[in-house]
């Protein structure tokens, strides 16, 4: 098998920046794909991704995919439940496979973690396994190195590989340039950082 050359799906959030930093440290990072799908937090999240790429001299590929639904829909606990774009990772991984092939990469790396699996079917081991089987038809592997980690463990890994936590964005419900502190993403991040 040839040496790993990864394309990371980079949102600018803690998880994706952590996997990008992991691949960079291993000298296996070929490029990052930054996707604007109309997410309400794009104004703050995407600059974090772009800045990370610039800081580390990593090729940043950009895609605009507004058809994914932007703000998405709520699941779970009514209006207070997590916001999701149904099948977002399915679409992003598909884009990633295409971009990987065009840009000479043989793997797509995603930042899914164990805490994501309850609310997001496309962050589960079974999904990543199936996506990998499909992508392998094109000679591209799908990797999710954080899949067995809780958000707290991701923070530990982020610190271990040198991620500047303050340079990442996790809020899905910003009311300005500061995180809301109350959305699911903010709560998970705060809990993980509290230890």
Residue ranges and their predicted role:
Residues 1-162:
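ATP-dependent adenylation/nucleotidyltransferase module used to activate substrates
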Residues 193-195:
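Short Cys/His-rich "knuckle" micro-motifs
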Residues 94, 167-191:
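Local cysteine-cluster metal-coordination motifs and their immediate loop/turn environment
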């Amino acid at each position: 098998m040839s040496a790993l050359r990864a394309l990371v799906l980079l949102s600018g959030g803690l998880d994706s920046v952590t996997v990008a930093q992991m691949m960079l440290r291993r000298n296996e990072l070929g490029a990052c794909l930054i996707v604007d799908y109309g997410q309400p937090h794009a104004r703050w999240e995407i600059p974090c991704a772009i800045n990370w790429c610039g800081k580390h001299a990593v090729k940043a590929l950009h895609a605009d995919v507004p058809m994914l639904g932007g703000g998405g829909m709520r699941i779970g606990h009514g209006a207070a439940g997590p916001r999701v774009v149904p099948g977002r990772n399915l679409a992003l991984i598909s884009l990633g496979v295409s971009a990987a092939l065009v840009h000479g990469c043989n793997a797509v790396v995603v930042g899914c973690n164990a805490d994501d699996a309850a609310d997001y079917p496309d962050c589960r081991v079974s999904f990543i396994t199936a996506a990998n089987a499909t992508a392998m038809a094109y000679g591209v592997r799908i990797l999710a190195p954080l899949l067995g980690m809780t958000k707290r463990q991701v923070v530990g890994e982020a610190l271990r590989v040198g991620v500047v936590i303050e340079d990442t964005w996790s809020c899905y419900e910003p009311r300005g340039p500061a995180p809301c502190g109350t959305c699911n993403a903010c709560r998970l991040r705060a809990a993980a950082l509290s230890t």
